[in-house]
Swiss-Prot record:
Domain named MHD: residues: 168-421
Lineage: Eukaryota, Metazoa, Chordata, Craniata, Vertebrata
Protein name: AP-1 complex subunit mu-1
Quaternary assembly: Adaptor protein complex 1 (AP-1) is a heterotetramer composed of two large adaptins (gamma-type subunit AP1G1 and beta-type subunit AP1B1), a medium adaptin (mu-type subunit AP1M1 or AP1M2) and a small adaptin (sigma-type subunit AP1S1 or AP1S2 or AP1S3). Interacts with MARCHF11.
GO molecular-function terms, A-Z: clathrin adaptor activity
């Protein structure tokens, strides 16, 4: 069982718009939602599911709005929450910003969307590209020439319309990897993983089939134990367009892509990652009157690669003042509102080492800090490089008209949650 009704409320709990799907819950029940929420908040016992009598309120907050679903039955809670977040996504794609004003300005479209998104309490069409075939930005049905059913009715490929045409046929594919890293104050790597995704922008005419081949090193977690130099991907998720049966048979990623931008696949690699940018810091406090920092940054990737827009965020005491900086490269900025200094290096080639010194005055005499010190965090982006070693071997584009298309492939490695603790 799913939702009985869905409401959008303002911050005071006033109903802006609602839709009754099953008729088994009194629509006035939502009046109890805000008092219960405030009571639980005061008690410090706030939860995403609230109850009044036999009615359950499942809710999320977005900007200055509450999205609430009610149910009297034994609802599938994860499905309801997934649906509420999907509603936020669809509304945001239609109105750019989902807030009270956009709700008030678009009542007609929202009612139409709510009718398509859910039927009798069960989620139905939640893909915004499909919805845009039924419901235009002005809230009217599409009418181009003679009336015709939407492409999704006649077409087995629901995520792509027929009759798409481009003067120039192109495909852009980005392999993006984010490195999550946590290093102890002693220099030991406590946690390291790679979170990757393959994102595409497709501008192709007709109904093309694409075939993507990755390098032989890449294995997927259900293929068994691989060779020592293989890349075993975990938590692999594909876009709905990928033919999973073919992938399970011969590991070919074959698909008819949606038009425009989408994420083809995502993956995770839980492995020991050599820190791409290594930070060593020496912090000296002198009689509570001043504090000195010596920070060394070293790039530990191949010399032919370069990290761009590197930012090293170094925490400093709240009461520090009178900053003085000296660095071999880049620039240093004190950000007092964040209690940190930011060392910025626009271009950081592989195999290089740079030094930065900072000096602060400490006007107040306080006892030694007993709380843990915040870690140093690093931001960076390395183009033409993947930490995992994943590579696109080929990207074939097959379309019955036989046109030539240009595939463009790009690799980017960037920081995720990248932190190094200090002594």
């Amino acid at each position: 069982m799913s939702a009985s009704a869905v409401y959008v409320l303002d911050l005071k709990g006033k109903v802006l718009i609602c839709r009754n799907y099953r008729g088994d819950v009194d629509m006035s029940e939502v009046e109890h939602f805000m008092p219960i929420l405030m009571e639980k908040e005061e008690e410090g016992m706030l939860s995403p599911i609230l109850a009044h009598g036999g009615v359950r309120f499942m809710w999320i907050k977005h900007n200055n709005l509450y999205l609430v679903a009610t149910s009297k039955k034994n609802a599938c809670v994860s499905l309801v929450f997934s649906f509420l977040y999907k509603v936020v996504q669809v509304f945001s794609e239609y109105f750019k910003e989902l807030e009270e004003e956009s709700i008030r300005d678009n009542f007609v479209i929202i009612y139409e969307l709510l009718d398509e998104l859910m039927d009798f309490g069960y989620p139905q069409t939640t893909d915004s590209k499909i919805l845009q075939e039924y419901i235009t930005q002005e809230g009217h049905k599409l009418e181009t020439g003679a009336p015709r059913p939407p492409a999704t009715v006649t077409n087995a490929v629901s995520w792509r319309s027929e009759g798409i045409k481009y003067r120039k046929n192109e495909v852009f594919l980005d392999v993006i990897e984010a490195v999550n890293l946590l290093v102890s104050a002693n220099g030991n790597v406590l946690r390291s993983e790679i979170v990757g995704s393959i994102k595409m922008r497709v501008f192709l005419s007709g109904m093309p089939e694409l075939r993507l081949g990755l390098n032989d090193k890449v294995l997927f977690d259900n293929t068994g134990r691989g060779k020592s130099k293989s890349v075993e991907l975990e938590d692999v998720k594909f876009h709905q367009c990928v033919r999973l049966s073919r992938f399970e048979n011969d590991r070919t990623i074959s698909f008819i892509p949606p038009d425009g931008e989408f994420e083809l696949m995502s993956y995770r690699l839980n492995t020991h990652v050599k820190p791409l940018i290594w930070i060593e810091s020496v912090i000296e406090k002198h009689s509570h009157s001043r504090i000195e920092y010596m920070v060394k940054a070293k790039s530990q990737f191949k010399r032919r690669s370069t990290a761009n827009n590197v930012e090293i965020h170094i925490p400093v005491p709240n009461d520090a003042d009178s900053p003085k900086f000296k660095t071999t490269v880049g620039s240093v900025k004190w950000v007092p509102e964040n209690s940190e200094i930011v060392w910025s290096i626009k271009s950081f080639p592989g195999g290089k080492e740079y030094l930065m010194r900072a000096h602060f005055g400490l006007p107040s005499v306080e006892a030694e800090d007993k709380e843990g010190k915040p870690p140093i965090s690093v931001k960076f982006e390395i183009p033409y490089f993947t930490t995992s070693g994943i590579q696109v071997r080929y990207l074939k584009i097959i379309e019955k008209s036989g046109y030539q298309a240009l595939p463009w492939v790009r690799y980017i490695t960037q920081n995720g949650d990248y932190q190094l603790r200090t002594q």
